[in-house]
């Protein structure tokens, strides 16, 4: 039993150590490489920098670092109240969790940052959120020494009975943490004294385990239950007895005595007020309870005697009690104790099973722990290898960057040398420029002399341009006159087209009248022959009108072509005007030309509209022709060849339109050769079809002549026999009436038969549906019959099985009697074997306890070794990280140096570009000045000199730089302002 209690104590110590690791160290273990810019600013408490980061990127409000910590978590952990208020003002997530599911409120409470916690609670933070271990903010407040945070949390409705994963309420957690002031505070705030953890330990048991006598007195003052047992069936008194905590045990015994005295007083007071019948029952109950208490005390005394550790005070107390209550109750107590012993045995068996299961679970946990440790070792080796690879890569990058730096140094030196050479070349260029400026002064003097002659030439050129402009204006006037004439022609063509449209409308009216007359002819059949000739004459007249309209259309097309040619001539004239205007640079002519172009485009659009109207008219003519052909078909068979002629006309019209298109296409530019080819192919196909249609027309005309001859013969025959057969017309009419009556009757019969057929078909459909329904019912009936047959078979089988079961029951009854006898024998044997097993179990339990102690020792030793190895690895890892950070800092320095070198190179390259541009400008100026000098020297007037008789003319000499005099030449000028006037005139000409 003592070993079991020591195991409980060790378990409590282990829990305390794990709890210290869990709650120790306020804030976070922070490394700089894990953080972003906003997180660093929050840790430093730089609210302005945090606000700047948020204005740049609003998403960074709830941004996480590499360990899932937000800005609010870090600010609360470090007590940065300004940053916390800023983030809450920006409406960040107040109850956001980190990797361990801890809220910013938990971090503020854990770090004892009361101001941050108050701000969070006032902004509506939830104090009842649980982390991975099931702890709330109140658990963290209990672990701290002060009670102000706990008061704040309780005022904001924190749950005082919140359970963590170990089953600890804040009160139990305070006892485990040995925080007496927190226990007092929680008891004042009505915390539950009778709460129990996962091992069913009460607050009193935990206080006894941790040897906290002051907390025990507090709990006893609150009337806590002394008799409550934990998972192992032990009370607080048992733990005090086994741990030799005499003062605590004495406190518990004194509390028991007080409770008994109070109970007896209450009983006496009640008995005085109650009836005598109820008094006996009360006394018997009180005696029974008292006897049970005495028996429990005797049991404790026996245990104390066996251990020889009970003080003499308790023995004297037991003897006095024995003397008070007498020996006559001992027999009853012995019987009760026997019953309790049987119950204890059963409990011990049940507990043994539990302990075995717990041992198995502990072994499994150890195995899992070893596996996890191995996996951690593998992970550590992998991480070490990975970091070593990263270090090698960084070293390689460092070497590469060093080589690049050396190259850049060489490039820099080379560029410096080039810059020096450029400086020298610039110095030489400047010297040359000074010389050129001196020469320029000489050239300017000569140029002023030439300005006068140029001015005269420019005046003559301007007079010529004015003459040309006058000619152009005259030509434009003529073009406008022609344009107006063309407009008049266009109006005339429009009027002609309107007249033709009216003529077409009249033709349409004539056609409609002809159709009406044809209908009347059909109705008036006897007078048909006389009216046929009239309709044929009208048809011929209509054809003549159509031909006339076609001729008029051809004339209009020719007029349109002439107008187009005139438009092309106008374009040529306008192009000539443009060339003249470009040479003369006259703005007025350009504006007039634009107006003419607009008018020309307008005329073109109108011409296109005329062509469209013409095409529509052609379509209307074709429709008229087709309608005529249809009417002629209905009128007689003999005039069927007209269809062929109409088709021929249509095809001929199509060929004519295609030729027109060809004519238009020939005028277009050379870019549309492909369209030309397609049109040529279409023309060839249309010619071929036109030839075939002509052949067919000839054949149709021959057939038409034959039909006409037949018609003439028939007409003559009819005229001959008209008088003779006039009497027969009445008979024919009566025959026709009879045939019509018969035809109507047949139609009625046919309709009746169709109606009967539809009725029969509907009846057939209904019968088919009824047939399907009956077929389905038949199938269902067959299925029912099969099921009935199966049920009958099953019934027979069940009857046979019932008979078999009855026979078996009789046999079983006989065997039961034998089994009962055998059972009684087995029970006796089982009792004997159970006694043996109890002895064996006690031995094995002792062995198991020894093995458990050894396992715990081995585990602790292995854990210590692993912790040491982990610490070594962490040290190595920290060294690696420091080396990596040093390398990164060096890299950043190299990068900064590289960036500076690049900037210097860029600035040098820009300077070089500027110098190159300056040199190019100077060279262009020199070149232009050389050309000017040559031009001026070539245009100087020749003067005879008496001193040089051999020289006749300056133009015959090649003026090179050798022959230019170094002294300044002075030429007298009559007007000193002429040079400035010339300059202004030249600038105006260049701007134009």
From Swiss-Prot:
SUPFAM superfamilies: Ankyrin repeat
Region (Disordered): 262-320
InterPro entries: Ankyrin_repeat_domain (IPR050657), Ankyrin_rpt (IPR002110), Ankyrin_rpt-contain_sf (IPR036770), CC144C-like_CC_dom (IPR039497), DUF3496 (IPR021885)
Ranges: ANK repeats: 67-96, 100-129, 133-162, 166-195, 199-228
Keywords for this protein: ANK repeat, Coiled coil, Repeat
UniProt superkingdom: Eukaryota
Pfam families: Ank, Ank_2, CCDC144C, DUF3496
Coiled coil: 278-310, 378-618, 683-713, 743-899
Basic and acidic residues bias locations: 286-310
Protein's name according to its UniProt entry: Ankyrin repeat domain-containing protein 18A
Gene: ANKRD18A
